[in-house]
Structures are given as structure tokens and as C-alpha cells.
């Protein structure tokens, strides 16, 4: 599976919070991918891999956790969709070598759609970066255009009428 090129994009959600650095560490994509799970079901014919039971996927500074992670491949063999489901599914990644703090995100479902360059966090979605937070039923982020939308979701366990954002003041240079 060609996960190396696409999973780091899943974690570039920091631009949704106004971060100056919307990219992951450049060395992350060159690191091996490690998948740990209680069970794995791989269907090469259908191009689907499903990992269940305390799933942890790491690549460089990036980590994804969920109860179930499903990866589907497109006809050309590239990763098409990665879906992490949990209570809550979680991801983190260091965004720059100059800033060791990791950007973090939680949701019942976190999905990366490679063909659309889109990350979707649904149901109890929350993203934290550099002290800033965004919470809502659904957060959608386009990794190519770096445009984020937060708002109402479809089937959610805890409906929210509004999004909630906290933006920290910029620190003045001394």
C-alpha cells in the first residue's frame, strides 16, 4: 500500500486553526509506517484493509489511534480513503522542527479522502494547535486549498447547536 504519501496529509489540519505552518515534518513521509492492532483483515482483491482493536498507526511524528481503521485503495494502488473510528479516534503530528508542540485532533470518525484532498472529522470533533481549539459536530479541511469549514454534522451522538473556537493572542516579539 502506498500510505507513505497520503497519511501525512491527514494531519495537516493545523491550517484550520490559522497556523503559519500547514505542513507536517518533511521527514515523516520518508519514515516507515507501523500498524499495531489486535486484528487485521486484508482483502487485496477488493483493495480494503481493516484493522481492529486499539489500532495505532505511526509514521515519523504522526500517530493515528482508533478502535477500527479501514484503508481502501484506488484502482492504481494508491490509498483512496482512510477512516479511523473510535471513542474517540485521535491523531497527532509535529508540524515543524522549530515547534515541538504537536497538533492534535479527536472525533468519533476521522476520514481522509485522498482523491478530494479532504479530511473530515465527524461527531464530537475537536482540533488543538498551539493553544487554539476548534470544536463542532463536523470539521472539514481541504489539504490542497487549506480551507476549513466547521459546523453541523449528520448522524452525531452529541448534537451541538454551534461551533466553539478559542484563538490565543499572538505573542509579541521581545
Regions found by a protein language model. Give the residues of each.
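Mature-chain termini and adjacent capping regions
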Residues: 1-174
Amino acid at each position: 500500500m502506498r500510505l507513505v504519501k497520503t497519511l501525512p496529509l491527514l494531519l495537516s489540519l493545523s491550517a484550520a486553526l490559522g497556523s503559519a505552518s500547514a505542513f507536517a515534518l518533511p521527514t515523516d513521509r520518508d519514515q516507515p509506517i507501523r500498524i499495531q492492532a489486535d486484528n487485521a483483515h486484508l482483502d487485496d482483491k477488493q483493495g480494503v484493509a481493516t484493522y481492529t482493536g486499539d489500532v495505532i498507526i505511526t509514521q515519523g511524528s504522526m500517530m493515528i489511534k482508533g478502535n477500527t481503521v479501514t484503508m481502501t485503495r484506488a484502482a492504481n494502488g494508491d490509498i483512496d480513503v482512510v477512516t479511523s473510528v473510535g471513542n474517540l479516534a485521535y491523531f497527532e503530528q509535529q508540524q515543524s522542527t522549530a515547534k515541538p508542540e504537536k497538533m492534535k485532533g479527536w472525533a468519533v470518525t476521522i476520514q481522509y479522502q485522498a482523491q478530494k484532498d479532504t479530511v473530515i472529522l465527524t461527531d464530537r470533533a475537536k482540533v488543538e494547535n498551539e493553544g487554539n481549539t476548534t470544536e463542532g459536530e463536523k470539521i472539514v479541511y481541504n489539504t490542497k486549498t487549506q480551507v476549513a469549514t466547521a459546523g453541523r454534522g449528520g448522524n452525531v451522538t452529541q448534537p451541538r447547536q454551534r461551533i466553539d473556537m478559542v484563538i490565543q493572542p499572538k505573542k509579541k516579539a521581545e
